[in-house]
Amino acid sequence: MISAGREGAEEAAAERGVDESGRTKLVAISVLTSMDENALRSIGVDGSIKDEVARLASLSYNAGADGIVCSPQEAQEMRELLGPDALIVTPGVRPEGAEKGDQVRISTPSAAIQAGASKLVVGRPITCANNPVEAFESIISELKN
């Protein structure tokens, strides 16, 4: 029973973003995946999205964040910039053929992982699916292949 309790606690901690040491992980949000270059300029940022994500990632990581939230399109550059231990969390992940919705900078689950993502955020393609369990299982199947 103690082992089962410990395993359950470890699983719950993993689901909450707590590592083996019990420390909560902190990731910094960069540029929203719903933003394009025009949207970035409209808030006063003149550089490219990739440059702004890199700037924010460097500032955050150097200040002690464990990683960055960025689109899958910036994941490879962030992995190279921040190194192998950084958490790269990528929203904007959509299975092939899924609706883009308001997301601009998207990728498939397998492409996001190949680009260096540590964690994927897949929301509406699962929650808005006719069969969410089937949608989830399809994504897992894609990742296993």
Model-derived features with residue positions:
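Conserved anion-binding
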Residues: 1-63, 74, 84-85, 95-98
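Conserved, mostly hydrophobic/aromatic
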Residues: 60, 78, 112, 123, ...
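Alpha-helix capping/helix-boundary segments
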Residues: 74-75, 126
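Hydrophobic faces of well-ordered beta-strands that scaffold small-molecule active sites
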Residues: 26-30, 68-69, 87-93, 120-122
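Short secondary-structure boundary/capping elements
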Residues: 48, 70, 101-105
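Small-residue (G/A/S/T)-rich helix-start motifs and N-terminal tracts that mark the onset
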Residues: 82, 119-120, 139, 145
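Glycine-rich phosphate-binding active-site loops on the catalytic face of alpha/beta enzymes
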Residues: 94-96, 102-135
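C-terminal helical cap(s) of enzyme catalytic domains, especially alpha/beta-barrels
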Residues: 2, 6-8, 12, 113, ...
